[in-house]
Amino acid sequence: MRHDPGLAIVRRAARVTLVACAAFYLCRYVLDSVIMAPYALFGVVAMGVLSQIPGSPAARARTLLAVLPVGWFLVTLGTLLSVTTATAVAGMFVFGFAVAYAGVGGPRLVGLAAGTQLLYILPCFPPFDPGSLWLRLAGLTIGVLLLAGAEVTLWPDATPTPYRTKLGDAVGALARCLDAVADMWSGRPEGGERFAAALPAATDAAEALRPSRLPPGLRPASAGRRDRALASAAGSARLLLGRTVDLSLVDDPCAVTLPAAAALLRQTASCADAAADWLRGEAEEVPDTDRIAAALVEFRAARDATSPDGLPPERLQLGSLALSLGEWTKSMVAAIRVAAGAPILPDNTPASAQPGPLWFAYRSTAGLWWHRIREHLTPRSVYFQGALRLALALAVARLLAGVFDLSHGFWVLLTVLTLLRTSAADTRSTLRPALVGTTAGALVAAVVLVVGLPPTVYAIALPVIMLVGFAAGPLLGPGWAQALFTLVIAFVFAQVSPVDWRLAEARIVDVVIGAAIGVLIGLLAWPRGGSGELHRATGTFLAAAADVVRETVGVLARDAAQGGALPRARQAGMLAEASYALYQTERHPPAAVDWQATLVAGHHAVRGAEALLRGCPTGCLLPCLAPLTTAAEDVADRYAQVGAGLLDRDRRATAPLPQRPALDWPTDLGMQLYALADLRVWLDGLRDDLGRIASIPADDDLRTRVAHLADGAS
């Protein structure tokens, strides 16, 4: 119970066992087909055990029905390409890569990859018998249809909370924090108490959006417009909460335009609350951006009505923070409208800076999928690396099985499929229990086969062994899974063809060969896995963020042309997020770098630059170009230094920041002082973000937890 709360794993194992045995017995004993029976059983194993299908029971059933034609296609190709070893190996490499690389489309496709791989592996071995293809397809169809029906009728799993609802909870909690800060700024003493009470729940709700806190299938990571928009809105919400805490710490009753800032914050809270209602399904109408846009116009007008000349720069900070929150809220609401399929304003991003922040809203679905496929088609992408690693391993396994004429070469490929991990270290760590388990299972199977039990005994024992095996794997580890699956295979083959103790011997040999192939490929193809790529990807991301800082200040200060720094940084951030997601699935010693803080620093640079370029006039700060350039170069150089250190694995690059340079800021620029304050708030925030990279946050430090909330980090 401790390892399986609610008995979800046991229920799933029982459901798959019942369906697999029913399909196998129907084909073997009722329809009397030794060809259909294995395909019915392994079709259920492929889709019910090796595949991880998310969603409600009805959604999983629909997914099974939708993937059935893909299964027909792969079984047909495997059957036809088994004519020679060369064609089978070529097909294994091509389709092994294609099926694994399809995972760039999102975790839902990743969950189907291993199962669909098995559907090609199963028929790609001799004998070449295209005449039996219809029997193979019929067996697969029976198994998948029975499994689809069982998903909604036999001990169905609970429907998980949709991501949209979780996002609604986080945005609603954010709205309460914003409203409490507005009360604080309006002089209401209860505002501070309300904020202190609301912040823990808001932090928990925001952290619940982290990919690491979600089942893979619920993460909004597909190539489609809706998932991209939900992920963008979640990133804005998490960023907003972190900056709301910064606002709560600003205690300046003499701040310029304090009443206007409080009014803007209250409108921001109201817009966030309306967005939360729609996300949770409590409102039918999707909120628009008109209200927050009007509030931003009113705030700027109120701010422009007060001359900042001669005022200390610190008195302008609060208004700049409030303005940034309003801009990010506008971006969040726009992303939610995209997720809802509602119209949004035209994209006004300059051609030189395309694609813009919400570029995906203006692309077709086919265009979005092509963009996702193309952007990861690089050796620097962990999706590309993983697909190529698996395709090579499966192709080599199929080649050796054909060259040495292994009697059950299918098991070699199945071993590779189930044991190969993303790093060489993780692959090696799975070998010992897998080999020990396989050997133990094979010894028991050999004894049983030597004794020579009647087929009826195998038929009766199969469901029991299968149930325990399917439940033991997730609960007790790969050793138990391999041991019991070896027995399952022996009991299955004993019912479809004459076998003896040599079947167990072949099983051990095939698993050893498959394990050796997995280790060899793991050592040759990107052996560090996510760790090695994460250093490179995050280093590149921070270097790109440095260019964003320089370019943004250049555009706003001296009206320089906006180039491609932002699009490059968005692309680098996407690859860094993918690398971090893979890194989290692997085993690593305690990190010397806070990877969450590293990603947050990059995302804050990108999001802040987007807001500044939308809301600030360009070329208005020439009189203070020298100190502004010095401040920007200080931050950009630090980003570049940390990025280079990550690329070189130099821990000294993440050492605490030196003191910021002492600069003489003008106080007589008129209204342009507000634009200067907006820029300085952004740059100061980026320095704070960089200062957190060298330290690992304590789990119970609420302020630090909030500071590490941004975009998809972790």
Regions found by a protein language model. Name each.
Residues 488-493, 511-516, 532-568, 572:
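Cytosolic/matrix-facing juxtamembrane and C-terminal tails of multi-pass cellular membrane proteins
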Residues 463, 478-487, 499, 689-692, ...:
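C-terminal functional regions that serve as terminal interaction/effector modules
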Residues 1-17, 21, 29, 52-53, ...:
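Long, hydrophobic alpha-helical segments that serve as membrane-spanning/inserting helices
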Residues 1-150, 154-155, 316, 327-483, ...:
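Alpha-helical transmembrane segments and their membrane-interface boundaries
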Residues 603:
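Gly/Thr-rich phosphate-binding loop signature of adenosyl cofactor/nucleotide-binding cores
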Residues 519-520:
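Cytochrome P450 heme-binding "Cys pocket" and the immediately downstream C-terminal segment
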